[in-house]
């Protein structure tokens, strides 16, 4: 077979065998030009010599050619004019033997094998073959250059197929046209999918319900129309003057209903006709092309339907409808060098349809060399990891430490546990987590919090609930918002809990929010006040001796605090004469609580 491609000079005694052998018969791109991945092309150039051969070089060329051409009929204004353009869209050369310019080389007798490989970009134009003068083709040409004889040349075509991805919408969405012709007919014409494999068949489902008594359905015609839009200069913005459009009918199906047996009840509502028709596509590209739009060649397909309606008065009406379809080439149906399907049996077409229907991305063939799961490092993939804590983040990373005015909810709760008691127990739980490395006495813990408040310039009772809201039974069960596996960290093994941050206590104090009653007693800073400078901040860190306190100030302070606690500048602001919120009546407190609850409900 390979020797039949020789042109002249090379006899069988000099080259017993010379051929191009590809690892794959064709290249497949899945998806459009903007989304398809690259493909790998590989093969071998085989040479078998029965005696020594003098050569100048051994080369292999891959060339892609695009040609657009059309003929205007003689009756048109162009008078039978022919327009065409041919371009080289791809070139690649492999030089396996090259002694140099003007030199020759003697190849001893034997077998030679020259491998080659190439990565083809996903945006390469696909092969378009089937029209007489318009095409996109790829050809291999291998040549053995000889000095005093004709070169030995062998050629082999390469087909590049652009097919749909298994996840393409054209494969999943059904196409249908439905409507009601008043006082005539209700109709529905549909196809299971928009995309159809070349060489298979198109199933069309009909549903026809007459709405006029005495109306009968006549001939039903289904046609597959192929349209060609050709452009000589697709990159030229003024190429509209060099375009040509043409259509042809690919297939025609005519059908008439059996009115005696076809009538049935549809959807348990009305009598009508419901049936399906199968339109067999041609098995050769010369009669039907695939849908494409590249290098000035655009091919599209659509289904046209005509349904004759015989009215009771004798005149004939016609229902017309159109559905778009997309024809693509499947890699499972091989096409030979003459553009015909190799296997044209119905079984092969059905296998191709089943393969497309059963494919689920990602395809196994595209992931043969992926790393196995057993070889992966589990760090970073399994959550929670070995170094992660078993519970939710701690207080510094959460907003649940906000000391809201939970005391206002006491009047609305129907349970035995008051909101203030719940807030107090949550605070005690947070304090327990803070002091996990050691267990100090309650006095040490309170003095530590007071010193932290003084360092930040915040009074000790600024975040506490109002007086009288802390009355709850000490024997009530302890409640917590944290998971049970996070409450007791004493029993957690080392390395299984999130490490504590050194600035935990400070961040916790800064992130707390005062209650509503405390916030309204605080003097509002003027809008024109600037931030404190460095000296003012340093001065606040210097311990201030306790000032003389009047009995009224000691009386206004929280009764739960000792008289030995220091007053900061914020404490004095609470007792300025202009602020009388601390002396509001119980009626005002109830109104304030009610407004707060209503505001929260709106949020």
From Swiss-Prot:
Pfam families: Arrestin_C, Arrestin_N
Keywords: Ubl conjugation pathway
UniProt record, GO biological process: regulation of protein ubiquitination; ubiquitin-dependent endocytosis
InterPro entries: Arrestin-like_C, Arrestin-like_N, Arrestin_C-like, Arrestin_domain-protein, Ig_E-set
Residue ranges with Low complexity bias: 465-481
Its job: Component of the regulatory network controlling carbon source utilization through ubiquitination and deubiquitination involving creA, creB, creC, creD and acrB. May be involved in signaling by recognizing appropriately phosphorylated substrates via its arrestin domains and then recruit a HECT-type ubiquitin ligase such as hulA, leading to ubiquitination of the substrate, providing a link between ubiquitination and phosphorylation in protein regulation and stability.
Family: Belongs to the arrestin family.
Subunit structure: Interacts with hulA.
Protein name as it appears in the record: Probable HECT-type ubiquitin ligase-interacting protein creD
Organism: Aspergillus flavus (strain ATCC 200026 / FGSC A1120 / IAM 13836 / NRRL 3357 / JCM 12722 / SRRC 167)
Lineage, broadest ranks: Eukaryota, Fungi, Dikarya, Ascomycota, Pezizomycotina
Gene label: creD
């Amino acid at each position: 077979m390979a020797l039949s491609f020789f042109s002249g000079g090379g006899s069988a005694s000099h080259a017993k065998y010379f051929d191009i052998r590809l690892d794959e018969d064709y290249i497949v791109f899945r998806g459009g030009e903007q989304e398809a991945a690259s493909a790998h092309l590989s093969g071998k150039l085989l040479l078998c010599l029965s005696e020594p051969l003098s050569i100048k070089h051994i080369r292999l060329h891959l060339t892609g050619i695009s040609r657009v051409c059309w003929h205007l009929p003689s009756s048109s204004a162009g008078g039978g004019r022919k327009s065409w353009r041919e371009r080289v869209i791809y070139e690649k050369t492999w030089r396996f033997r090259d002694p140099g310019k003007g030199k020759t080389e003697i190849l001893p007798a034997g077998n030679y094998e020259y491998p080659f490989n190439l990565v083809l970009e996903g945006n390469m134009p696909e092969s378009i073959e089937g029209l007489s003068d318009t095409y996109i083709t790829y050809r291999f040409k291998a040549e053995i250059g000889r000095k005093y004889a004709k070169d030995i040349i062998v050629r082999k075509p390469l087909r590049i197929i652009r097919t749909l991805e298994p996840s393409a919408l054209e494969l999943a969405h059904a196409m249908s046209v439905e409507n009601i012709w008043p006082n005539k007919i209700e109709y529905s014409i549909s196809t299971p999918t928009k995309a159809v494999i070349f060489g298979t068949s198109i199933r069309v489902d009909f549903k026809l319900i007459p709405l006029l008594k005495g109306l009968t359905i006549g001939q039903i015609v289904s046609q597959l129309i192929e349209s060609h839009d050709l452009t000589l200069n697709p990159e030229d913005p003024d190429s509209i003057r060099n375009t040509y459009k043409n259509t042809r009918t690919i297939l025609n199906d005519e059908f008439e209903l059996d009115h005696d047996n076809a009538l049935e009840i549809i959807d348990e509502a009305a009598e009508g006709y419901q049936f399906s028709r199968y339109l067999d596509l041609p098995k050769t590209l010369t009669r039907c092309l695939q849908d494409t739009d590249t290098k000035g060649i655009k091919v599209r397909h659509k289904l046209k339907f005509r349904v004759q309606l015989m009215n009771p008065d004798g005149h004939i009406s016609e229902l017309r409808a159109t559905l778009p379809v997309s024809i693509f080439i499947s890699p499972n149906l091989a096409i030979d060098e003459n553009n015909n399907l190799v296997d044209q049996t119905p079984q092969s077409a059905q296998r191709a349809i089943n393969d497309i229907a059963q494919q689920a991305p990602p395809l196994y063939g595209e992931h043969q060399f992926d790393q196995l799961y057993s070889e992966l490092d589990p760090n970073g993939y399994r959550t929670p990891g070995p170094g992660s804590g078993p519970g939710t983040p701690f207080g510094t990373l959460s907003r649940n430490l906000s000391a809201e005015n939970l005391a206002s909810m006491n009047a609305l709760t129907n349970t035995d546990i008051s909101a203030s008691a719940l807030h107090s127990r949550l605070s005690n739980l947070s304090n327990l987590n803070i002091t996990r490395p050691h267990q100090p006495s309650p006095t040490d813990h309170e003095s530590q919090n007071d010193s932290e408040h003084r360092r930040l310039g915040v009074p000790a009772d600024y975040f506490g609930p109002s007086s009288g809201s802390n009355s709850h039974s000490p024997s009530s069960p302890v409640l917590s918002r944290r998971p049970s596996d996070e409450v007791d960290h004493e029993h957690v093994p080392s390395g299984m809990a999130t490490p504590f941050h050194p600035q935990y206590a400070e961040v916790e104090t800064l992130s707390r929010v005062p209650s509503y009653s405390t916030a309204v007693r605080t003097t509002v800073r003027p809008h024109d006040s600037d931030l404190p400078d460095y000296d003012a901040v340093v001065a606040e860190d210097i311990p201030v001796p306790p000032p003389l306190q009047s009995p009224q100030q000691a009386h206004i302070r929280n009764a739960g605090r000792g008289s030995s606690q220091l007053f900061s500048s914020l404490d004095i602001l609470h007792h300025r004469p202009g602020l009388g919120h601390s002396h509001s009546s119980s009626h005002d407190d109830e109104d304030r609580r009610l407004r707060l609850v209503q505001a929260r409900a709106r949020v």
